[in-house]
Amino acid sequence: MNATTEMESPLVFTDSAASKVKSLIDEEGNPDLKLRVFVSGGGCSGFQYGFTFDEAQNADDTVMVKNGVTLLVDSMSFQYLVGAEIDYSEGLEGAQFVIKNPNATTTCGCGSSFSA
Protein backbone atom coordinates (compact mmCIF):
# COMPACT_ATOMS: atom_id res chain seq x y z
CA MET A 1 0.00 0.00 0.00
CA ASN A 2 1.34 3.40 -0.94
CA ALA A 3 -0.03 6.34 1.03
CA THR A 4 0.75 9.94 0.16
CA THR A 5 -0.33 12.42 2.81
CA GLU A 6 -0.19 16.20 3.20
CA MET A 7 -2.16 16.66 6.45
CA GLU A 8 -3.54 14.64 9.33
CA SER A 9 -0.71 12.17 9.16
CA PRO A 10 0.30 9.81 11.95
CA LEU A 11 3.77 11.37 11.60
CA VAL A 12 4.78 15.01 12.02
CA PHE A 13 7.42 16.31 9.59
CA THR A 14 8.22 19.82 10.82
CA ASP A 15 8.82 22.88 8.65
CA SER A 16 12.32 23.12 10.12
CA ALA A 17 13.17 19.55 9.09
CA ALA A 18 11.66 19.97 5.61
CA SER A 19 13.57 23.22 5.10
CA LYS A 20 16.90 21.63 6.08
CA VAL A 21 16.27 18.59 3.85
CA LYS A 22 15.43 20.92 0.96
CA SER A 23 18.70 22.82 1.39
CA LEU A 24 20.68 19.54 1.53
CA ILE A 25 18.97 18.28 -1.63
CA ASP A 26 19.68 21.61 -3.35
CA GLU A 27 23.38 21.26 -2.37
CA GLU A 28 23.47 17.77 -3.92
CA GLY A 29 21.91 19.08 -7.12
CA ASN A 30 19.62 16.05 -7.45
CA PRO A 31 15.92 16.99 -7.20
CA ASP A 32 14.93 13.28 -7.24
CA LEU A 33 16.31 12.73 -3.73
CA LYS A 34 13.89 11.95 -0.91
CA LEU A 35 14.58 11.67 2.82
CA ARG A 36 14.19 8.11 4.12
CA VAL A 37 13.76 7.69 7.87
CA PHE A 38 14.11 4.17 9.23
CA VAL A 39 14.41 2.14 12.41
CA SER A 40 16.94 -0.66 12.71
CA GLY A 41 18.09 -2.99 15.46
CA GLY A 42 21.09 -1.81 17.43
CA GLY A 43 22.21 1.13 19.48
CA CYS A 44 22.46 1.21 23.24
CA SER A 45 18.70 0.83 23.80
CA GLY A 46 17.77 -1.86 21.25
CA PHE A 47 16.65 0.20 18.25
CA GLN A 48 18.18 3.13 16.46
CA TYR A 49 16.98 5.76 14.02
CA GLY A 50 18.58 6.27 10.65
CA PHE A 51 18.35 8.92 7.95
CA THR A 52 19.44 8.57 4.35
CA PHE A 53 18.68 10.05 0.96
CA ASP A 54 17.00 7.77 -1.55
CA GLU A 55 15.85 8.18 -5.14
CA ALA A 56 13.65 5.07 -5.05
CA GLN A 57 10.20 4.90 -3.52
CA ASN A 58 9.14 1.36 -2.55
CA ALA A 59 5.59 0.06 -2.88
CA ASP A 60 5.20 -0.34 0.92
CA ASP A 61 6.58 3.10 1.82
CA THR A 62 4.50 5.65 3.65
CA VAL A 63 5.07 8.92 1.82
CA MET A 64 4.73 12.43 3.20
CA VAL A 65 5.28 15.62 1.24
CA LYS A 66 6.01 18.86 3.09
CA ASN A 67 7.03 22.10 1.40
CA GLY A 68 8.07 20.19 -1.71
CA VAL A 69 10.20 17.67 0.21
CA THR A 70 9.32 13.96 0.22
CA LEU A 71 9.75 11.84 3.36
CA LEU A 72 9.72 8.03 3.03
CA VAL A 73 9.20 5.48 5.81
CA ASP A 74 9.19 1.73 5.16
CA SER A 75 6.33 -0.31 6.62
CA MET A 76 8.46 -2.04 9.27
CA SER A 77 9.86 1.24 10.58
CA PHE A 78 6.49 2.98 10.36
CA GLN A 79 5.02 0.88 13.18
CA TYR A 80 7.70 2.28 15.54
CA LEU A 81 7.26 5.85 14.31
CA VAL A 82 3.47 6.33 14.50
CA GLY A 83 2.86 9.57 16.39
CA ALA A 84 6.50 10.67 16.16
CA GLU A 85 7.75 14.12 15.21
CA ILE A 86 10.69 14.44 12.84
CA ASP A 87 12.39 17.77 13.47
CA TYR A 88 15.64 19.60 12.82
CA SER A 89 17.22 21.36 15.77
CA GLU A 90 20.13 23.77 16.11
CA GLY A 91 21.44 24.33 19.62
CA LEU A 92 24.47 24.27 21.88
CA GLU A 93 24.98 20.57 21.14
CA GLY A 94 25.13 21.27 17.40
CA ALA A 95 22.64 20.87 14.59
CA GLN A 96 20.87 17.57 14.03
CA PHE A 97 17.71 15.83 12.96
CA VAL A 98 15.70 14.77 16.00
CA ILE A 99 12.88 12.27 16.37
CA LYS A 100 10.48 12.83 19.25
CA ASN A 101 8.83 9.45 19.61
CA PRO A 102 5.96 8.83 22.06
CA ASN A 103 6.38 5.06 21.50
CA ALA A 104 9.89 5.02 22.96
CA THR A 105 9.83 3.70 26.53
CA THR A 106 13.48 4.62 27.08
CA THR A 107 15.92 6.67 25.05
CA CYS A 108 19.67 6.88 25.08
CA GLY A 109 21.62 10.05 25.79
CA CYS A 110 22.78 10.06 22.18
CA GLY A 111 19.18 10.66 21.06
CA SER A 112 19.38 8.16 18.22
CA SER A 113 18.68 4.97 20.17
CA PHE A 114 15.47 3.86 21.92
CA SER A 115 13.47 0.91 23.18
CA ALA A 116 9.79 0.31 22.58
UniProtKB/Swiss-Prot annotation:
Keywords: Iron, Iron-sulfur, Metal-binding. SUPFAM superfamilies: HesB-like domain. The keyword Repeat does not apply. Iron-sulfur cluster binds at C44, C108, C110. One of its GO terms (molecular function) is 2 iron, 2 sulfur cluster binding. Signal peptide: none annotated. Binds 1 iron-sulfur cluster per subunit. InterPro entries: FeS_biogenesis (IPR000361), FeS_cluster_insertion (IPR016092), FeS_cluster_insertion_CS (IPR017870), FeS_cluster_insertion_RrpA (IPR023063), HesB-like_dom_sf (IPR035903). GO terms for biological process: iron-sulfur cluster assembly. Pfam families: Fe-S_biosyn (PF01521). The keyword Metal-binding applies. Its cofactor is iron-sulfur cluster. NCBIfam families: iron-sulfur cluster assembly accessory protein, PRK13623.1. Belongs to the HesB/IscA family. Homodimer. PANTHER family: IRON-SULFUR CLUSTER ASSEMBLY 2 HOMOLOG, MITOCHONDRIAL. Required for insertion of 4Fe-4S clusters. This is Putative iron-sulfur cluster insertion protein ErpA. It comes from Thiobacillus denitrificans (strain ATCC 25259 / T1).
